[in-house]
Curated annotation (Swiss-Prot):
Keywords: 4Fe-4S, ATP-binding, DNA damage, DNA repair, DNA-binding, Helicase, Hydrolase, Iron, Iron-sulfur, Isomerase, Metal-binding, Nucleotide-binding, Nucleus, Phosphoprotein. This is Regulator of telomere elongation helicase 1 homolog. Belongs to the helicase family. RAD3/XPD subfamily. Residues 7-324 form the Helicase ATP-binding domain. GO terms for molecular function: 4 iron, 4 sulfur cluster binding; ATP binding; ATP hydrolysis activity; chromatin binding; DNA binding; DNA helicase activity; DNA polymerase binding; metal ion binding. Its EC number is 5.6.2.-. GO terms for biological process: DNA recombination; DNA repair; DNA replication; male germ-line stem cell population maintenance; negative regulation of DNA recombination; negative regulation of t-circle formation; regulation of double-strand break repair via homologous recombination; telomeric loop disassembly. It comes from Drosophila willistoni. SUPFAM superfamilies: P-loop containing nucleoside triphosphate hydrolases. A probable ATP-dependent DNA helicase implicated in DNA repair and the maintenance of genomic stability. Acts as an anti-recombinase to counteract toxic recombination and limit crossover during meiosis. Regulates meiotic recombination and crossover homeostasis by physically dissociating strand invasion events and thereby promotes noncrossover repair by meiotic synthesis dependent strand annealing (SDSA) as well as disassembly of D loop recombination intermediates. ATP binds at residues 42-49. [4Fe-4S] cluster binds at residues 148, 166, 175, 211. A motif (DEAH box) lies at residues 254-257. It is an enzyme of class 5 (isomerase).
Length: 998
């Protein structure tokens, strides 16, 4: 690889670095050389991550080389045994220096590379693998949730439960995987590869039957660079638990645009009345089994880590804490009441929680958690208690008393206590717990407006509004350098002021692309000349919502491939979707590009992204609607065809009346001076929204040869205060005095921009792997529950047939057979209803019946392909089916056409009374067929009943059954009624069969 001398250090880069990359690497090396801190901004797509890794590791390698020379010198001197004129033996002195140098690792710093999410860390490790520094030792630290391979631990729900179960098994020496770490940690399969990400660690762990979680920690001491999430560094409890040593370490915080919030959150904590109540119950429970004969069943003759006196004292303290919280007055039941920071210390002091005994109590709580886990494991008849309340209390004490007594004046300025009423958890059909019957906190959920606040359960929030606390704790660990970097850090001065760290190097890089590769416009009015402004007063305006939809529709006709649309919030996204469905705009947009909505669930998110990336390969592309600050806007890669344009529909301001937002603004106003250059409360409020916009914009234009459009569809973007907070490279495209442009000229310019780009820019090759998402399918076969199935059809593409697309067909086939949960019923999406009404043009392949295909895939935005083509060569024709009259004959005809295709033999079909009529196997075809037999109102009721059944229980099932027999009870529709059986939850199928039989 080419070598460049940057700041005196030879740096090997995969190609000749661009000027912005050279400037960035120079700043990094200067920080490392001088032991100073840096704040460096470089737009997404400028090779920031690669520049970070190459420059920092080049400096490390140079230092290692220098130290090797020093070692050789000392070794040569150690071999010289002649006595000098002073009587000192040089060899002995050199040998001593050699020993001391090795013990101190020769003073060569190590790199800790931290980012917000593990997907971002995975991307960084990919960059490292393709660099000249792939041979340097690296390791990634992950959570038990990602790395644990013990089947019983992985069955636990929730990360905290997995942590406790793991600790219990390690403590009791019952985890064979962890016990095997010591004997397998030097195995070539584990020590051989220099770079192993999370997936690699899990594979090696499974192969060697060795715990990847604990094994990864064995690599830290020898690693030149360690990858980890932010919270491992900034959270004091996580840092302690993972035994992270930061002395003489280079800390790189990538994607640091949210670093202030992360620092504030790491120093904040919350405890609820119910947490204290459960802790009291758990202590009482331990005292009971501690003194009973049954305790011998799981404790044996080993000395216990605590005494009955310890438990008695802790229970007394918890009862006093409950009493103290009971006495807290909440003046405003709706919004809560704010107290100064000293109130938290006074509250804890009433229960005798102090600086003096904090450490010993936290240690006791940790022992009690382990005790409960062992007790529950060894006595299956006991109620499973996992000590979650003890962990909450331990976190509270650790964070509150982490602030030393000598800085209490600063604590009082930077922290606030906010008390809210705790909402009751509804346990329908279950008897009230004992604590509730006795009037304890678990029973204080009947929060009526006329009851006094002292009779209510409380939520005590200890909030930090000064991110400098988190950074100060980091600097106090004697790190060598801290480098903050992101594509959206500006303005830098307020950021540096808030973090309160000395910064010697700062940088705002321009973008790497030419002006001709980016089209940026502010769209102030829609095609109907309605003003586009997503403020509080206008967001419910039907005319505005309609105009915004028309704008997106017109843009979707012009933009090739992927179109991203970001909304200020989920409620605004849902409001627009509902309105556009009703008006028909949704179907019009979907006809141009299949629409995908950002889901909130982790599993659904991965699946949706895979389907979107696949749909991009269709000639029409796809449209993804997401939310600023959501998962899509934070770190995902929409390079090249995946994202040719991004539409920002509004400014995502934080909730104005949120207590935390109010208190943050007050903190800034109270502590702002000319010297510290803090923002005003209003400036911070505006900047918080604009940074989220900058981050969303950064999803497109991901490399030097990429191109795309950025459309800001809110007239407020022309305000000078908003423009100045946009990234520097975007401001350059808007000009000195940005103004809203008329919609007509924008459409013409946008069309010309893409026509010119497609003619002059290098077009990307077809990608074989999708960014940050695991390739979960195989070309030849897919394994599902130990059954292998080969693709049923082969698809050919002929020139000129835009409707026929092999990749789209492949997507539909493979996504249909990829099932993550065997009994999962997910949300209906707007596309399902549009498809059922026959208004979309893109369909996905029908596949053989599968007990999970319909309901478990309801969150998919990929419609179905109907195989009605009578042409040769097994070509699949994607067509638009017109609404036909609701006659049984039409349905039968469609069914006959489908019989041309042979299904696999081992698929079970549902019982039917008719040999000629079967319910369609495809979700969309099933909905479409139901739609043919019932009217619009009945179909709406049908959809609502299914949505209710998704999260409901027996009552929702009864409602669904009543409606199904009403709508589909006629003889000619019986096959549809029977066909829905395979989409029911397992516990309801027997009852369904019984009712159908009668």
């Amino acid at each position: 690889m080419p070598e460049s001398i940057i700041a005196g250090i030879p740096v090997h880069f995969p190609f000749e670095p661009y000027e912005v990359q050279r400037a960035f690497m120079e700043k990094v090396i200067i920080c490392l050389r001088d032991g100073t801190n840096g704040v460096l901004e470089s737009p997404t797509g400028t090779g920031k991550t690669l520049s970070l890794l190459c420059s920092s590791l080049a400096w490390i390698r140079t230092r290692q080389s220098e130290q090797q020379k020093q070692i050789r010198k000392l070794q040569d001197a150690a071999n010289n045994t002649k006595v000098g004129p002073t009587g000192i033996v040089p060899g002995e002195a050199a040998e001593l220096a050699l020993t001391v140098g090795k013990a101190n690792n020769w003073g060569v710093p190590k790199v800790i590379y931290a980012s917000r999410t593990h997907s971002q860390l995975t991307q960084a490790m990919r960059e490292l693998k393709r660099s000249a520094y792939a041979g340097m030792r690296s390791v990634v630290l992950g959570s038990r949730d990602q790395l644990c391979i013990h089947p019983e631990v992985m069955r636990e729900q929730g990360n905290s439960n997995k942590v406790n179960m793991c600790k219990m098994r390690v403590h009791s020496k019952t985890c064979s995987f962890q016990l095997r770490v010591e004997s397998k940690k030097d195995h070539p399969d584990f020590r051989g590869p220099s770079i192993m990400d999370i997936e690699d660690l899990v594979k090696v762990g499974q192969k060697l039957k060795m715990c990847p979680y604990f094994a990864s920690k064995e690599l830290v001491n020898d690693a030149d660079i360690t990858f980890m999430p932010y919270n491992y560094l900034l959270d004091p409890m996580a840092r302690k638990a993972n035994k992270i040593e930061l002395s003489n370490t280079i800390v790189i915080l990538d994607e640091a645009h949210n670093i202030e919030k992360i620092c504030e959150e790491s120093a904040s904590v919350q405890i609820k009345s119910s947490d204290v109540a459960v802790a009291i119950e758990d202590v009482t429970h331990i005292m009971r089994i501690f003194t009973s004969a049954d305790s011998q069943d799981f404790s044996g003759d080993e000395p216990k880590d605590f005494t009955l006196d310890d438990l008695t004292l802790l229970k007394e303290m918890l009862l006093e804490l409950e009493k103290a919280i009971d006495g807290v007055v909440v003046d405003n039941l709706a919004e809560g009441t704010t107290y100064p920071a000293s109130y938290m210390y006074e509250l804890l002091a009433k229960a005798n929680f102090t600086y003096g005994n904090c450490a010993s109590i936290v240690a006791l709580l940790d022992k009690l958690v382990q005790y409960l886990m062992v007790a529950s494991q060894n006595n299956s008849s006991m109620i499973m208690r996992k000590g979650g309340s003890f962990l909450v209390l331990a976190e509270l004490l650790t964070i509150v008393f982490a602030n030393k007594e000598d800085i209490m004046a600063k604590v009082h300025r930077s922290f606030k206590v906010h008390v809210e009423v705790e909402e009751a958890k509804q346990n329908a059909g279950k008897p009230a717990p004992k604590q509730q019957q006795q009037g304890g906190w678990l029973g204080k959920g009947n929060n009526t407006s006329n009851s006094s606040s002292s009779n209510k359960a409380k939520v005590i929030n200890f909030w930090c509004f000064n991110p400098g606390f988190g950074m100060e704790q980091l600097l106090n660990t004697q790190v060598r350098s801290v480098i903050l970097t992101s594509g959206t850090l500006a303005p830098l001065k307020p950021l540096i002021a808030e973090l309160a760290i000395p910064v010697a190097q700062h940088l705002e890089n321009p973008h790497i692309v030419d002006q001709s590769q980016v089209y940026v416009k502010i769209i102030g009015t829609g095609p109907d000349r309605q003003q586009l402004i997503s403020n509080f007063k206008n967001r419910d305006n039907p005319k505005y919502i309609s105009s915004l939809g028309q704008t997106i529709l017109n843009v979707s006709r012009i933009v090739p491939d992927g179109l991203l649309v970001f909304f200020p919030s989920y409620p605004m996204l849902n409001k627009c979707v509902d309105a556009w469905q009703t008006s028909g705009l949704w179907a019009d947009i979907a006809a141009k590009k299949p629409i995908f909505l950002e889901p909130r669930g982790k599993d659904q998110f991965t699946t949706t992204m895979e389907e979107f990336y696949q749909a991009i390969r269709d000639s029409k592309g796809a449209c993804f609607m997401a939310v600023c600050r959501g998962k899509v806007s934070e770190g995902l890669d929409f390079a090249d065809r995946n994202g040719r344009a991004v539409i920002i529909t509004g400014l995502p301001y934080p909730p104005l009346k949120d207590p935390k937002v109010i208190l943050k603004r007050r903190y800034l106003e109270a502590n702002r001076t000319k010297e510290n250059q803090l923002l005003t409360g209003q400036e911070w409020y505006n900047l918080d929204a604009t940074r989220a916009v900058n981050q969303a914009i950064g999803r497109v234009i991901r490399h030097r040869h990429d191109y795309g459009a950025i459309l800001l569809c809110d007239s407020r973007f022309q305000d000078n205060s908003q423009v100045q907070q946009l990234s520097k490279w975007i401001r350059g495209h808007l000009g000195a005095r940005p103004q809203c442009s008329p919609f007509g000229p924008i459409v013409r310019e946008l069309r010309q921009f893409f026509r010119h780009a497609e003619e002059t820019m290098e077009q990307p090759k077809e990608r074989t792997d999708e960014p940050l998402l695991k390739n979960v399918y195989k070309t030849e076969a897919v394994t599902q529950e130990n059954n292998e199935e080969k693709p049923l059809f082969k698809v050919k593409r002929e020139p000129g047939q835009m409707a026929t697309n092999a990749a789209a067909f492949k997507q539909a086939n493979e996504m249909a057979i990829k099932v993550e949960m065997t009994n999962s019923i997910k949300s209906w999406t707007p596309d399902d209803y549009v498809s059922a009404a026959g208004r979309t043009q893109s369909h996905s392949q029908s596949k053989p019946p599968n007990a999970m295909d319909f309901m478990s895939r309801l969150d998919s935005n990929v419609s179905s392909i109907d195989f009605n083509s009578t042409g040769t060569g097994n070509l699949v024709k994607i067509h638009k089916r017109e609404r036909s009259s609701p006659t049984f004959g039409d349905t039968k005809s469609s069914s006959q056409l489908k019989k041309r295709y042979k299904l696999v033999d081992n698929i079970k079909t549902e019982p039917s009374t008719s040999s000629s009529c079967k319910a369609p196997e495809s979700r969309a075809d099933f909905l479409r067929e139901v739609r043919c037999f019932i009217n619009q109102d009945e179909f709406r009721d049908f959809g609502k009943a299914l949505l209710a059944y998704k999260n409901g229980g027996d009552e929702a099932f009864e409602s669904l059954m009543s409606l199904l027999f009403k709508l589909l009870g006629k003889p000619q529709m019986r096959y549809l009624l029977l066909g829905i059986r395979r989409y029911l939850k397992n516990e309801h199928k027997a009852e369904f069969d019984k009712r159908v039989a009668t």
